[in-house]
Protein backbone atom coordinates (compact mmCIF):
# COMPACT_ATOMS: atom_id res chain seq x y z
CA UNK A 1 0.00 0.00 0.00
CA UNK A 2 1.25 3.47 -0.90
CA UNK A 3 1.57 5.79 2.08
CA UNK A 4 1.93 9.55 1.78
CA UNK A 5 3.31 11.29 4.87
CA UNK A 6 2.91 14.97 5.60
CA UNK A 7 0.56 17.65 6.88
CA UNK A 8 -2.82 18.10 5.22
CA UNK A 9 -2.74 21.89 4.85
CA UNK A 10 0.65 21.91 3.07
CA UNK A 11 0.33 23.11 -0.55
CA UNK A 12 2.85 20.54 -1.80
CA UNK A 13 0.93 17.76 -0.05
CA UNK A 14 -2.23 18.96 -1.76
CA UNK A 15 -0.47 18.79 -5.16
CA UNK A 16 0.82 15.28 -4.44
CA UNK A 17 -2.61 14.09 -3.32
CA UNK A 18 -4.25 15.54 -6.45
CA UNK A 19 -1.61 13.81 -8.61
CA UNK A 20 -2.18 10.44 -6.92
CA UNK A 21 -5.95 10.75 -7.25
CA UNK A 22 -5.76 11.91 -10.89
CA UNK A 23 -3.62 8.86 -11.66
CA UNK A 24 -5.96 6.47 -9.84
CA UNK A 25 -3.36 5.43 -7.29
CA UNK A 26 -4.78 4.14 -4.02
CA UNK A 27 -2.90 5.55 -1.06
CA UNK A 28 -3.15 6.15 2.63
CA UNK A 29 -2.45 9.64 3.94
CA UNK A 30 -0.59 9.85 7.25
CA UNK A 31 -0.93 13.32 8.76
CA UNK A 32 1.86 13.89 11.28
CA UNK A 33 -0.35 16.21 13.32
CA UNK A 34 -3.34 13.83 13.45
CA UNK A 35 -1.70 10.40 13.30
CA UNK A 36 1.49 11.30 15.12
CA UNK A 37 5.07 10.35 14.42
CA UNK A 38 6.70 7.70 16.55
CA UNK A 39 10.45 7.44 16.98
CA UNK A 40 10.69 4.11 15.15
CA UNK A 41 9.07 5.51 12.01
CA UNK A 42 11.18 8.67 12.15
CA UNK A 43 14.34 6.59 12.57
CA UNK A 44 13.37 4.56 9.48
CA UNK A 45 13.08 7.82 7.53
CA UNK A 46 16.42 9.10 8.85
CA UNK A 47 18.21 5.81 8.16
CA UNK A 48 17.03 5.74 4.55
CA UNK A 49 17.12 9.41 3.60
CA UNK A 50 19.45 11.06 6.11
CA UNK A 51 18.43 13.68 8.66
CA UNK A 52 19.81 16.51 6.52
CA UNK A 53 17.42 15.65 3.68
CA UNK A 54 14.42 15.34 6.02
CA UNK A 55 14.99 18.62 7.84
CA UNK A 56 13.20 21.38 5.92
CA UNK A 57 15.49 24.36 6.44
CA UNK A 58 13.70 26.41 3.77
CA UNK A 59 10.28 26.36 5.43
CA UNK A 60 8.52 28.78 7.74
CA UNK A 61 8.86 26.53 10.78
CA UNK A 62 12.67 26.51 10.49
CA UNK A 63 12.85 30.26 9.85
CA UNK A 64 10.78 30.93 12.98
CA UNK A 65 13.28 29.07 15.18
CA UNK A 66 15.76 31.21 17.04
CA UNK A 67 19.38 30.94 15.96
CA UNK A 68 20.42 29.15 19.15
CA UNK A 69 17.93 26.35 18.49
CA UNK A 70 18.95 26.06 14.83
CA UNK A 71 22.63 25.86 15.79
CA UNK A 72 21.91 22.93 18.15
CA UNK A 73 20.80 20.72 15.23
CA UNK A 74 24.11 19.07 14.41
CA UNK A 75 23.39 15.35 14.17
CA UNK A 76 20.66 12.75 13.68
CA UNK A 77 19.72 12.66 17.37
CA UNK A 78 19.22 16.42 17.71
CA UNK A 79 17.38 16.58 14.38
CA UNK A 80 15.11 13.67 15.38
CA UNK A 81 14.26 15.34 18.68
CA UNK A 82 13.28 18.54 16.87
CA UNK A 83 11.27 16.67 14.20
CA UNK A 84 9.41 14.73 16.89
CA UNK A 85 8.55 17.95 18.70
CA UNK A 86 7.76 19.92 15.53
CA UNK A 87 6.72 17.57 12.68
CA UNK A 88 5.99 20.57 10.42
CA UNK A 89 9.76 20.91 10.09
CA UNK A 90 9.98 17.63 8.16
CA UNK A 91 10.30 18.07 4.41
CA UNK A 92 7.21 16.86 2.63
CA UNK A 93 5.67 14.97 1.09
CA UNK A 94 7.31 11.66 1.87
CA UNK A 95 6.05 8.79 -0.26
CA UNK A 96 6.54 5.17 0.77
CA UNK A 97 5.82 2.00 -1.16
CA UNK A 98 6.94 -1.31 0.37
CA UNK A 99 10.04 -2.64 -1.36
CA UNK A 100 10.97 0.67 -3.01
CA UNK A 101 13.21 3.54 -1.92
CA UNK A 102 11.33 6.39 -0.24
CA UNK A 103 10.61 9.48 -2.34
CA UNK A 104 10.94 12.87 -0.67
CA UNK A 105 9.37 15.98 -2.18
CA UNK A 106 6.99 16.28 -5.10
CA UNK A 107 7.23 17.00 -8.78
CA UNK A 108 5.06 15.67 -11.55
CA UNK A 109 8.06 14.11 -13.28
CA UNK A 110 9.44 12.42 -10.15
CA UNK A 111 6.06 10.85 -9.38
CA UNK A 112 5.63 9.71 -12.98
CA UNK A 113 9.04 8.06 -12.91
CA UNK A 114 8.50 6.57 -9.44
CA UNK A 115 5.18 4.94 -10.35
CA UNK A 116 6.34 3.88 -13.79
CA UNK A 117 8.94 1.74 -12.02
CA UNK A 118 6.46 0.23 -9.50
Swiss-Prot record:
The lineage of its organism: Bacteria, Pseudomonadati, Pseudomonadota, Gammaproteobacteria, Enterobacterales. PANTHER family: ARSENATE REDUCTASE (PTHR30041), PROTEIN YFFB (PTHR30041:SF8). NCBIfam families: arsC_related, PRK10853.1. Belongs to the ArsC family. One of its GO terms (cellular component) is cytosol. This is Protein YffB. InterPro entries: Arsenate_reductase-like (IPR006660), Thioredoxin-like_sf (IPR036249), Tscrpt_reg_Spx/MgsR (IPR006504). The active site is at 10. Pfam families: ArsC (PF03960).
Amino acid sequence: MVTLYGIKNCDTIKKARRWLEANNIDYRFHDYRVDGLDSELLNDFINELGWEALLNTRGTTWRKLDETTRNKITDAASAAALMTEMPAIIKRPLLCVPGKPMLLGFSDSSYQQFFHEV
